[in-house]
Amino acid sequence: MDNNKGYIMAKFNKKKLPSRHTSLGADRAPHRSFYYAMGETEKDVAKPFIGVVSTWNEAAPCNIALMRQAQSVKKGVRSNGGTPREFCTITVTDGIAMGHEGMKSSLISREVIADSAELTVRGHCYDALVGIAGCDKSLPGLMMSMVRLNVPSVFIYGGSILPGRYKGKDVTVVDVFEAVGKHSSGKMSSAELRKLELVACPSAGACGGQFTANTMACVSEAIGLALPYSAGTPAPYEERDKYAKESGKMVMQLLKKRIKPRDIVTRKALENAATIVLQ
């Protein structure tokens, strides 16, 4: 029993899990050799394999804190009897892609994210999945993959950016977008625009506005794939790492109880999510 949260340390029968195909029996000796090459022990290989996927990259601040949070997820998995297998997938960040040909890549990136996460989990026979995402299309992409795979899964949002300060007021990238319009109409000088853009985004995290990322973060809780209250904490806060670790612990409980995304993402759950978005 975990002393803090009451999680039950479960023993798993690997013969009933997908990862048996890559880790059990004499004919899987080569597979096990690969795992030993990565530092895993015989005990680790005998445990359930849990995919930990993030959309970490340096395209925008939305995703740069995700690798840190992934390490906390892995700690939660290991402390509850699993062996985490971390991997990354792509993301196209609308904040950088907007205003030029790059935006043609945005929506299709959602499908690529879903496909790539699904292929990785299926190809390596992972038993469960924790997904961490930080920008517009990556959140629905990972949640889509979870429902398609239908292995025990937990989603966690990477968190929103902190506001900047300009002329004594909180500002976000929304203010910079509006400032571009003011500048084009002659209501703001180039010097003022430069000062604003330098301070508007002071940290890691998704766009500080009610755009797709923060909206889908709310949806992730409403449909039941994310832990309650996990969407609200900004990306730089250490509390995000606590939610990440708890997500790693929770996915092990879902695996033990055989609770899968399609048990959670019901029509009622989707109606609940729609209500949240429309409010």
Set out the residue ranges of the language-model regions.
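A short N-terminal beta->alpha junction/helix N-cap motif
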Residues: P18, T22, E40, N57-A65, ...
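Long, structured ligand/cofactor-binding scaffold of large enzymes
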Residues: E42-Y157
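Active-site cavity-forming subdomains of large catalytic enzyme subunits
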Residues: S106-Q279
